[in-house]
Structure formats: C-alpha cells, structure tokens
A protein has these predicted regions:
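Acidic/glycine-rich phosphate/pyrophosphate-binding loops and surrounding catalytic core
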Residues: 93-119
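Structural motif
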Residues: 59-63, 126-127
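Short, glycine-rich nucleotide/cofactor-binding loops
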Residues: 32-37, 122-132
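Conserved small/polar residues in nucleotide/adenosyl-binding loops
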Residues: 134-141
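Short, aromatic/basic amphipathic alpha-helical patches
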Residues: 66-76
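A glycine-rich helix N-cap at a beta->alpha junction
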Residues: 79-82
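Boundary-proximal intrinsically disordered activation/regulatory segments immediately upstream
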Residues: 1-61
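Glycine/small-residue-rich loop that forms an oxyanion/phosphate-binding "nest" at active or ligand-binding sites
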Residues: 89
C-alpha cells in the first residue's frame, strides 16, 4: 500500500474524492460500473466484507497507524492519500468521518430476471434520484 502525501488541492489521483459529482462517480471508468465513496472504517469494513473492490483511500495522517490501520491493511496495494486535517477538509468539503474515505468500485447491477426470480412481490418507486441512499427490502410475512 503506497502512502502518498498530499501537498495541494490539485494532487494527481485525488479527483475521485473531490472533483466528481455523484452522477460522474456512477459513470466513472465505464457505464454499468462506477465508483462510490465509503465513509468511515465501519462502512468501509462492511463494503469489503460484501466483496466490494477498493480503489483508493484518503486518510488523515494520524489515522494511518490508528483507527484506519486495519482498513488500510485489508485494502492491500491500493494507494492511500494522506495529509493534514485542514487540507483534507478543504479538499473534500467536509471533515472526514472518523478520518478515512475509500473509493470503491460499484458492483454490476443484477438483471431484471435475477431480481424477479423467486419473488412474489415487487415494489416500483418512481422519481428516486439518489439511489445510493435507497436500500429497500420487502419482507413478506407468512
């Protein structure tokens, strides 16, 4: 895992954390596969447990050997961008949640056939714009 010290807001490689909108992240690299930003060690750990692929980390310097150490280790050889809190806050626009962010590849969405297989009830919601916050599961009681 290369630790890369950030010295300016235009440092190469950090655009995924600050220069792209949610829509641009969804289409990053190739349509159908995009990128999302996981915030905090707990969220990153759950994403890794679910099989999501880490692409890069951004971490406050003090957390590299602290609260983010286990996440950094689990992410293998992905770059870890670091700097002081003020620079990272300016770069991202907010204080990093528990000091660490992780850019991760979005999974390929399942086909309609896969979604509907063995399903008795489907809910269709119109007008949802930010799907990253919509995690609905319908549980049917017998």
């Amino acid at each position: 895992m290369p630790i890369i010290e950030i010295s300016s807001l235009t440092h190469p490689g950090v655009d995924v954390f600050c220069m792209l909108t949610e829509a641009q992240l969804r289409q990053r690299m190739e349509p159908g596969k995009g990128v999302f930003i996981a915030e905090s060690p707990n969220v990153i750990s759950r994403a890794l447990d679910a099989g999501y692929e880490p692409l890069a980390l951004m971490c406050e310097r003090k957390h590299i050997s602290g609260s983010a150490a286990h996440i950094i280790k689990r992410c293998g050889d992905v770059p870890v961008y670091t700097g002081d809190r003020e620079l990272l806050t300016t770069l991202t626009g907010y204080v990093l949640t528990r000091g660490v962010l992780c850019a991760m590849r979005r999974p390929v969405l399942p086909s309609m056939e896969e979604i509907c297989r063995d399903t008795r009830r489907i809910v269709v919601i119109d007008g949802v714009v930010a799907v990253s916050y919509t995690h609905l599961r319908a549980h049917e009681t017998s």
